From Swiss-Prot:
Transmembrane segments: none annotated. The gene is mnmG. This is tRNA uridine 5-carboxymethylaminomethyl modification enzyme MnmG. SMART domains: GIDA_assoc_3. Gene3D superfamilies: FAD/NAD(P)-binding domain, GidA associated domain, C-terminal subdomain, tRNA uridine 5-carboxymethylaminomethyl modification enzyme MnmG/GidA. Belongs to the MnmG family. NAD-binding protein involved in the addition of a carboxymethylaminomethyl (cmnm) group at the wobble position (U34) of certain tRNAs, forming tRNA-cmnm(5)s(2)U34. GO terms for cellular component: cytosol. It holds the Pfam family GIDA. FAD binds at residues 13-18, 125, 180, 370. Keywords: Cytoplasm, FAD, Flavoprotein, NAD, tRNA processing.
Amino acid sequence: MDFSQRFGVIVIGGGHAGTEAALASARMGVSTLLLTHNIETLGQMSCNPAIGGIGKSHLVREIDALGGAMGRATDKGGIQFRVLNARKGPAVRATRAQADRELYKAAIRGTLENQPNLTLFQQAVDDLVVENGRCVGVVTNMGLRFMADAVVLTAGTFLGGVIHIGLDNHQGGRAGDQPSNALACRLRELPFRVDRLKTGTPPRIDGKSVDFSVMEEQWGDNPLPVMSYLGKVEEHPQQVCCYITHTNAQTHDIIRSGFDRSPMFTGVIDGVGPRYCPSIEDKVNRYPDKDSHQIFVEPEGLNTHELYPNGISTSLPFDVQLQAVRSIRGFENAHITRPGYAIEYDYFNPQDLKHSLETQHMPGLFFAGQINGTTGYEEAGAQGLLAGLNAARLSQGKDAWTPRRDEAYIGVLVDDLITMGTQEPYRMFTSRAEYRLLLREDNADLRLTEKGRELGLVGDERWAAFNAKRDGMASEEQRLKTTWVRPKTPEAEAVNALIEKPLTHEYNLLDLLKRPELTYANLAEAVALADRPDSAVIEQMEILAKYAGYIDRQADEIEKLRAAETTALPVEFDYGQVKGLSNEVKQKLSEIRPQTLGQAGRIPGVTPAAISLLMIYLKKHHHQKKAAQQA
């Protein structure tokens, strides 16, 4: 049976990628259908109850700057907020929020249900409708056909999902949910490169059975940060304490005793796990000389006693899990409410995608989230937003848009995946970005919101708030540039008390703010500066003053590299014609098909010398072609 309404975009999956994809498409005015196997699990946090962290909060802010939901939902559901790397430079500072699972999920669902142009429908998808090599719809498990101009697939861990606890395993997309096996089989018939990855989760613990008095308390920051540019501290629910405890030598002995029944060490699991979030058995095996590993004990919510012991993800047999947990300080009488487990699932080589996240082999089909080999809610949400907006633009007959590496961490994420691929779950870090001083958490709106408005992603409320901030920055910068402090005045004496060497000639306030001893607050106090602006404007003034030289230098580097970054490589380019390229380089370039010289240069094994040869070849043939046309 065919559904009566045709949609512009269909999104399969209601996780973090799927919800951002559906919302982005609908915000752009395109009729959008979100299909999920269970409406009650929309926006569910399947693993840890937290959003943000190093590199990840940068993605959340970028999603937010483009009108996405993750940041706002975090402010409404966050029960502890902390700024990580607060004493380091602004490029690596990151906000992390502990979230109440139910409050977060409710915020996402409310956003979905109130979004114009968006329809929700509860049905699992078993098949794709393909006509003339193009994806034009989907078929649900009850045979209902939905047709569309574009389809975004965000299946998470559900494609061929297998859950492992010890040597026992069963099919599942996550605990309590069936996998999408029919769809997984259908996708394996298509010309995509498919492999397996693994992720895991720790056992959950009943807080009533835990002795918190022997653990280290970890409270959130005060004053409280916010995650969204539109966020307000008043939106935050009650704030709670997290705790820290540690494994010990006894814990590690218990874990080692279960290695012979571990699916990881007996070859039962083939998939590769996340390097930066290893299981506790992997850590014990990899670091045999380490007697202790830190565990963050995180509340799951305000209305539950369940705890998430971050740091002991495991797929060991349940009896080993229970013994290991009870050997940990504070957990001696712990009751496990849900066992930890590992899950194996299908993912598809992201090198088979375009930068728009549309698949190369099937027009109209987009992939986003863990299906592309990433791990993390934030990475999924960022891909979902990009896939959703480009699916909508395809429906509108418009060209795709993807941010460059120097514009956004979203650009870094997508370019890394497509240029280099991944053989393990990919996680974002600030170290992955060459231009991280320009791609800060605090300026994602200044980088992206204007473009988001142009794309149709940003609504009036966000646009007004952005303009107020931008205008405030311009006004304050002008004021600081034109307010002078002259030697031997009361203002100069007040400033001299804060700095090592006294002022010998006049300075404007912006130049004074470049000095490491001075902050906006103590400088404004010293010169009795009235009518101080919003804290976000003050933050920008300090960063732009103190890091001006570094920021200008990075901007110059970007400008120099822009030529290579934008030099297009023809789709059917014959790399065999370029003399001097090694067979390895020819093979990699022919396989990956980079779109630009800049992208080609980031492929492992493609040397700067090879890029120079390509550049010379392109210039030579461009001139030959031009001469032939003139003749």
